[in-house]
Amino acid sequence: FRAAQFGIHHFCTMALNPREANDDRVNDAVMAVLPRFLEKDGVLGIGEIGLDDQTKKEEKYFTAQLELAKQHDLPVLVHTPHRDKKKGFQRCIDLIRDCGFPMARILLDHGNEETIKITREVGCWQGFSIYPNTKMDVHRMVAVVREYGVERIVVNSAADWGISDPLMIPKLVQA
């Protein structure tokens, strides 16, 4: 509604983020209202869902939201852990498979050079978050694109936690 007041057709994904999945003050309340938001115009998928600290609660809400995505025929944006990334990527893939969700409708985000091989093997989309000091930087991303091409790759930047630069994508294009 707010974006439309300024002539902007806003698109987004909606979810209980894994960072909040462990917070009993909000997790069930968010899950209770989430289905009604998934019906709204402009909601293109469910996400970010996934794992952060790789807890049983995160797994519970991850699989519950995968089921919602199936019910609403929506693609899924998956947050993968920043720590113990390879293990977390594999656990996300295992949970997705266990739910029977189509891999081609999954974007596994926050990837790196180590995870691109995994996503290529299973048929997911691979997301890369470009940050100035953490996650992927411009030069590492250029190397990934040179080696693997751009097929099934999504690159994003952010202005969220800590030091970030929302203009990293134009900087990547110039590199």
Regions of interest found by a model, annotated:
Residues 1-73, 78-95, 110-114, 121, ...:
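Mid-domain alpha/beta scaffold segments of enzyme catalytic cores
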Residues 4-8, 98-102, 148-149:
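Short helix-capping segments at alpha-helix termini
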Residues 23, 135-142, 164-165:
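Short, charged, surface-exposed secondary-structure boundary motifs
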Residues 104-105, 125-132:
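Short hydrophobic/aromatic-enriched beta-strand-loop microsegments
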Residues 114-115, 140:
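Short acidic active-site motifs
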Residues 130-135, 159-160:
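Short, acidic/turn-prone active-site loops that include or flank metal/cofactor-
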Residues 148-166:
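Short acidic/histidine-rich active-site segments
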Residues 170-175:
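Mid-to-C-terminal alpha-helical segments outside catalytic/metal-binding sites
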